[in-house]
From Swiss-Prot:
Pathway: Pyrimidine metabolism; CTP biosynthesis via de novo pathway; UDP from UMP (UMPK route): step 1/1. It catalyses: UMP + ATP = UDP + ADP. Keywords: ATP-binding, Cytoplasm, Kinase, Nucleotide-binding, Pyrimidine biosynthesis, Transferase. Belongs to the UMP kinase family. The keyword Cytoplasm applies. ATP binds at residues 12-15, 54, 58, 162, 168, 171. It holds the Pfam family AA_kinase. InterPro entries: AceGlu_kinase-like_sf, Asp/Glu/Uridylate_kinase, Uridylate_kinase, Uridylate_kinase_bac. PANTHER family: URIDYLATE KINASE (PTHR42833), URIDYLATE KINASE PUMPKIN, CHLOROPLASTIC (PTHR42833:SF4). This is Uridylate kinase. GO terms for biological process: 'de novo' CTP biosynthetic process; UDP biosynthetic process. It comes from Ruthia magnifica subsp. Calyptogena magnifica.
Amino acid sequence: MLMSKYKRILLKLSGEALANTENIIDPVALNKVVNIIKSVLSQNVEIAIVVGGGNIFRGAVLAQAGMNRITGDHMGMLATVMNALAIADVCQKNKVDTLVMSGFSIGGGVCDSINHVHAKQALNEGKVVIFCAGTGSPCFTTDTGAALRAIEIDADAVFKATKVDGIYTSDPIKNSDAKRYDSLSFDGAIEKNLQIMDVSAFALCREHDLEICVFSMLENTNTLSDILKGKPLGTIVRK
């Protein structure tokens, strides 16, 4: 088997990846995610996940309607906990060991609090670590949370799954003339204001020389596995 150049990756999933038009958490979508996880593990690559909560709640949207932004962000972070528990449950049913870690303390044995040492130990043991609650603080996106967790666990790269197959000059869903980048520098992505990730996430990854790959897993669940095998898919952002 061709060995991947990556030993440990962090996969950033949106909450929408777990939903369909009828269900905020769709069993079929969950199983697709678990199959992707298993394909990564089969290549002897360790994987951690940061999951969003937009399928359940978006604090920023309700803030525009008058809700206190801090309250909305706290509610959004709680939504990510529900998504993380759902992924972990289906993983366990498929004999994939997991460890769920939250950015803020949750009692009652629901999940562990973030501890980068314990997270790395779990990854070394072959477990999938699922991070939730973003950074644990309001006013930060889950993209920034993904960058932070990737740095904490010494990941080789952040893989962000999106609706499109990379980073484009403009939104390809709205503009059919948009062109896809094969690769970008962090400075270029920030200067061009390409809003596939927020500036804080790009800046953190740039500072720590942490590669980002933006790709789509909507049409082909093998895309991440293919990238790990060296196929030139998606858009790579690096120094």
